[in-house]
Design a protein with these regions (language model features):
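C-terminal domain-closing interface element
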Residues: 201-220
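Conserved mixed alpha/beta catalytic, RNA-binding, or beta-rich assembly cores of soluble enzyme
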Residues: 1-170, 178-197, 209-212
Length: 220
C-alpha cells in the first residue's frame, strides 16, 4: 500500500501529477540496497523532478536539505521518491531505470491508464495496480475539497489544513505569489511527494476564478 494513492483532484489536474518511488522488502532485497537507492535518486534527478526526497531526511524544498548529501545519506531501508508533472518525462525515467536494472521495487502513483501507457511505451508491463478505497468514517469532519487537494499531495498529510487556508488567503491578498505559497506548503512535506507545480497551478486558478469559500459544502 502507498499513501500517495489518496491524492484528490479532477482528472485533468491528476494528469500532471506522478510520484515514482523505490521500496525494498525486509528479508528479500533490503540488505545492501543503499547504493541502488542512491542510483535511483541520481537517475530521477537528471530529469528535473519538481520535488524529491525521503521521509527520514526531508525534501529538496526544505531549507537545510542539500541534494548531494541527501543522496549520499540513503540507507538500505530508505523509501525515496520523486515527483514529475508529465508522462513523457516519467517514461524517460522508467526507461533509464529499466536499463539500470537495480533489482528493487519501483512504484508509480498516477492515473491508472496513464501509468499503464507509460509502462507500455517503456517496453514493460506493470506488475500490479492498487486503488484507494476513498475516505470512510466521519467525512463531515473533513475540510473543503479544495483544501484536500493540497493536503493529500503529502503522503503523510503533514501540510495542515490551517496552513493551506492561510496560504490561500496570502495569495488572495497578494502578499504571496502562488509559487511562493506552493513552496511554503512543500516545506512541510517530509517525504518529498508534494507537487509544487500542481499546487502553484491550483492557487493560480483559485486567484483567477474565485477563492475558497468556507461556507461551501464540505467533502461529500
Amino acid at each position: 500500500m502507498t499513501n500517495t494513492l489518496h491524492r484528490q483532484g479532477n482528472r485533468e489536474d491528476l494528469k500532471h501529477d506522478f510520484v515514482i518511488f523505490v521500496h525494498t522488502a525486509k528479508g528479500k532485497n533490503r540488505e545492501g540496497a543503499a547504493p541502488k537507492i542512491r542510483e535511483f535518486m541520481r537517475i530521477c534527478l537528471k530529469y528535473h523532478p519538481v520535488n524529491m526526497g525521503d521521509v527520514k531526511r526531508g525534501s529538496i524544498h526544505q531549507d537545510d536539505v542539500e541534494i548531494d548529501r541527501l543522496i549520499a545519506g540513503q540507507e538500505d531501508n530508505t523509501v525515496a521518491g520523486a515527483v514529475f508533472t508529465d508522462m513523457e518525462t516519467l517514461q524517460k525515467v522508467v526507461e533509464e531505470l529499466i536499463r539500470a536494472d537495480l533489482g528493487i521495487c519501483i512504484n508509480i502513483t498516477g492515473l491508472l491508464d496513464e501509468v499503464k501507457e507509460c509502462c507500455r511505451k517503456a517496453g514493460i508491463t506493470r506488475h500490479s495496480a492498487e486503488h484507494s478505497l476513498g475516505v470512510w468514517g466521519a467525512k463531515d469532519r473533513l475540510p473543503e475539497r479544495e483544501v484536500l487537494e493540497f493536503n493529500t499531495m503529502c503522503g503523510h498529510g503533514m501540510v495542515s489544513f490551517n496552513l493551506i487556508r492561510k496560504m490561500i488567503e496570502q495569495v488572495r491578498l497578494r502578499r504571496m505569489t502562488p509559487k511562493q505559497a506552493a513552496l511554503m506548503m512543500a516545506k512541510c512535506c517530509e517525504c518529498g511527494a508534494f507537487n509544487t507545480t500542481r499546487a502553484e497551478a491550483l492557487l493560480t486558478r483559485m486567484r483567477e476564478r474565485g477563492f475558497l469559500d468556507s461556507s461551501r459544502t464540505k467533502h461529500d
